[in-house]
Design a protein with these regions (language model features):
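Electrostatically charged, flexible surface regions
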Residues: 3-4, 153-263
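N-terminal nucleotide-binding beta1-loop-alpha1 segment
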Residues: 7-26
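Residues at the starts of beta-strands that form the adenosine-phosphate
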Residues: 10, 60-64, 87
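Short, glycine-rich nucleotide/cofactor-binding loops
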Residues: 14-16, 33-45
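A short, N-terminal amphipathic alpha-helix
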Residues: 43-60
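A glycine-rich helix N-cap at a beta->alpha junction
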Residues: 74-111, 187
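Glycine-rich phosphate-binding loop signature in dinucleotide/nucleotide-binding domains
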Residues: 112-122
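Short Gly/Thr/Asp-enriched flexible loops that form oxyanion-binding sites at enzyme active sites
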Residues: 134-147
């Protein structure tokens, strides 16, 4: 782990390594979760992009990517390094698949405290609103509770004004603006614009990077059991109606809807 300079503002992005469901759909196989191809959780990638945009405006921001996983399970962290992270840390747990949201939050809080002992206090802690596998949206607020920090969720945009973090967040009426004193925790949804892509050079550097591992002292007892994963059923495929007249098209549409039990 790099030693940030004394002027750096430390920002930690918590991210999860999740099954690559697109590959699972193509293979159409049932596999135990540890054998599935993996990728960086999409909303965590948006949290990383929000962090990178803050660094674009303030070069003193130092981004550390943090993930829980088995020893050597660092693919998501290498993706983060290739995209925007300055360094990365893997907090080692024997079996992350059996941890519920509260256990994950407690372990992340433990890891963050260990990082702070070496690199100094973290002013900002970002994460995705939820993961594509768990979808509980509980880790962000529970992590803030474990660290006794203010929290804002469903973030769409982040900006800094002195010692205050401003989060534009989505809500039922559109968007709202939340201000929090630093340090704080924020969870991000799909933010406007697409996340930046890694370059060939950054990907090569990330593939060679040495990612330090943290040994956590307090591992909660397993609470979940994942027996298998399977691709979702694809359902009925789209149909193109190419009749000469509108009347013939309407007749075919009626027949298709009737056969599908819609009518």
């Amino acid at each position: 782990m790099m030693e940030p300079s004394g002027t750096d503002r430390n920002l930690i992005v918590c991210m999860k390594q999740v099954p690559d469901l697109s590959i699972g759909r193509r293979e159409k196989t049932e596999q135990p979760p540890q054998r599935l191809p993996v990728r960086l959780n999409l909303l965590d990638a948006y949290a990383l992009e929000a962090a990178a945009r803050l660094r674009d405006a303030d070069k003193n921001i130092h981004i550390t990517a943090l993930s829980l996983g088995r020893s050597g399970e660092d693919e998501a962290l290498r993706q983060a390094l290739a995209i925007a992270a300055d360094d990365a840390v893997l907090a080692v747990v024997p079996d992350p698949d059996v941890l519920d949201a509260l256990a994950v939050s407690r372990l992340l809080a433990q890891a963050i405290r260990l990082i702070e002992k070496k690199a100094g206090p973290a002013e900002l802690i970002f994460c995705g609103q939820q993961s594509i596998d768990g979808q509980s949206a509980q880790v962000g607020p529970q992590l803030a509770q474990c660290l006794n920090l203010p929290f804002a969720g469903r973030g769409l945009e982040a900006s800094l004004c002195g010692g205050v973090m401003r989060i534009r967040q989505g809500n039922e009426d559109g968007t709202g603006l939340v201000e929090m004193d630093l340090p704080c925790v924020a969870a991000f949804d799909k933010i406007p614009g697409e996340p930046r892509l890694p370059t060939v050079r950054s990907s090569m550097e990330a593939s060679r990077a040495v990612i330090p591992m943290l040994e956590l002292s307090e591992i909660p007892a397993p609470l979940l059991t994942v027996r298998e994963t399977r691709p979702a059923s694809r359902g009925m495929q789209g149909v193109r109606i190419c009749k000469q007249t509108g009347e013939d098209s309407a007749k075919q549409l009626f027949q298709l809807l009737n056969a599908a039990g819609v009518l």
